[in-house]
């Protein structure tokens, strides 16, 4: 109120705290709405010369969907069909598969190899190329990739939130003039924003200045994905609880995501470190964008729609979820359609819900619900229904400036994947 407006020179501790809280409220949520692509796609190899390849913000044409064999096998030739026998051989293979214009090849080779070793995953050309393709798509092999127009996006989001929460402009302007821990004012730092790592650091500095802010405001950090593979920070935090991190214990998992080594490790884990029945790598690319098992679940939704006659969103989410990740009480459209088939499936409501709760695991494929639904779908349509389907999701975020979908993303990465396999053939 009036006290805040009078605070132009020396502020009391309480007034400073209120100013900072006002600033945190307006910054929280900026650019973090939607966890998908945070920058325009890096150009494909055939769209740019070598000298231009380091400009990931350039607009790129969508390639035609690449041809794939029925089982998604890599092209025949000199690529090793079995894992390489040693880390030394793996490094040689990774260097061979990286695009020619990648800078710091040795560092990228080392971090990719160490991630596979730490995750105890066999290093085949197909798996290595999957990781290389995602890195190329998400960051153009920049460990801290720039987001074109990030400062402008943040200012727009700040203004929207200022109006939403009724914060007087004079109060916000005063808060922005405060000197931050790095010696610059918060206004100057926002004007200079170029990367998500910088945005993350700004928010962390803000929250650290509010008494108890690190604990109180941690869940409101607007940056939810980051690093060269744009991996989810929530996923990274869960990963270190399940498996030992291969490097020295970091000050924070969040900060480690923004490093090359951490971003590569967590990204490869998200992409490849889970069992799936997919015959083609493109469905892992779709899952990387939409969530694990989304391609399998979208196919399940398609089969369910055929049997029930209901029009369903093929988004790969079978249930509704709360912010904490637990299933919501409100039934999803997929759940309602499934319940409408109780008698035909010979399953009760409790059994159906029990099976649907396994949608984020491989075990879902062995449930009575999954097996009986597909038996119905196959017999009803007279053909074997697909068991995997790229989810149909429109990607939305303040950072996205043109229509993008999960299908676009998956085909884009698949094209890079095929290019990588061809490099191994040459």
Task: Describe every region a protein language model picked out.
Residues 18-28:
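Bacterial N-terminal signal peptides
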Residues 3-20:
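Bacterial N-terminal signal peptides that target proteins for export
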Residues 7, 29-426:
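Cell-wall glycan-active module
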């Amino acid at each position: 109120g009036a006290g805040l407006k009078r605070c132009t020179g020396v502020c009391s501790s309480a007034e400073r705290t209120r100013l900072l809280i006002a600033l945190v409220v307006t910054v929280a949520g900026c650019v973090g709405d939607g966890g998908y692509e945070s920058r325009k796609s890096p150009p494909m190899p055939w769209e740019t010369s070598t000298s231009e390849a380091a400009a990931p913000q350039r607009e790129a044409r969508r390639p035609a969907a690449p041809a794939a064999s029925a089982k998604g096998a890599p092209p025949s030739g000199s690529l090793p069909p079995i894992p390489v026998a040693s880390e030394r051989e793996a490094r040689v293979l990774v260097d061979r598969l990286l695009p020619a214009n990648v800078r710091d090849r040795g560092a990228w080779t080392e971090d990719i190899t160490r991630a596979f070793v730490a995750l105890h995953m066999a290093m085949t050309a197909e798996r290595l190329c999957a990781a290389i393709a995602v890195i190329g798509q998400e960051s153009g092999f920049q460990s801290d990739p720039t987001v074109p127009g990030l400062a402008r996006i943040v200012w727009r989001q700040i203004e929207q939130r200022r109006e939403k929460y009724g914060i007087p402009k004079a109060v916000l302007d005063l808060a922005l003039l405060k000197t931050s821990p790095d010696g610059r004012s918060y206004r100057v730092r926002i004007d200079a924003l170029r990367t998500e790592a910088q945005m993350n650091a700004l928010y962390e500095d803000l929250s650290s200045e509010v008494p108890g802010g690190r604990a109180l405001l941690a869940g409101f950090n607007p940056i939810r994905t980051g690093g060269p593979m744009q991996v989810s920070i929530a996923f990274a935090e869960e990963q270190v609880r399940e498996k030992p991190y291969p490097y020295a214990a970091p000050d924070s998992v969040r900060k480690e995501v923004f490093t090359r080594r951490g971003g590569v490790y967590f990204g490869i884990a998200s992409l490849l470190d889970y069992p799936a029945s997919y015959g083609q790598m493109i469905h892992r690319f779709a899952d990387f964008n939409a969530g694990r098992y989304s391609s399998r679940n979208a196919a399940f939704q398609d089969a369910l729609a055929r049997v029930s006659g209901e029009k369903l969103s093929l988004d790969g989410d079978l249930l509704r979820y709360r912010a904490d990740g637990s299933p919501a009480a409100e039934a999803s459209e997929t759940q309602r359609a499934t319940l409408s088939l109780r008698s035909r499936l010979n399953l009760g409501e409790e059994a159906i819900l029990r099976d649907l709760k396994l949608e984020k695991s491989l075990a879902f494929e062995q449930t009575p619900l999954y097996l009986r639904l597909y038996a119905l779908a196959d017999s009803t349509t007279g053909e074997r229904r697909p068991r995997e389907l790229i989810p149909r999701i429109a990607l939305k975020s303040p950072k996205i400036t043109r229509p993008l979908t999960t299908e676009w993303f998956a085909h884009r990465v698949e094209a890079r994947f095929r290019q990588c396999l061809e490099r191994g053939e040459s």
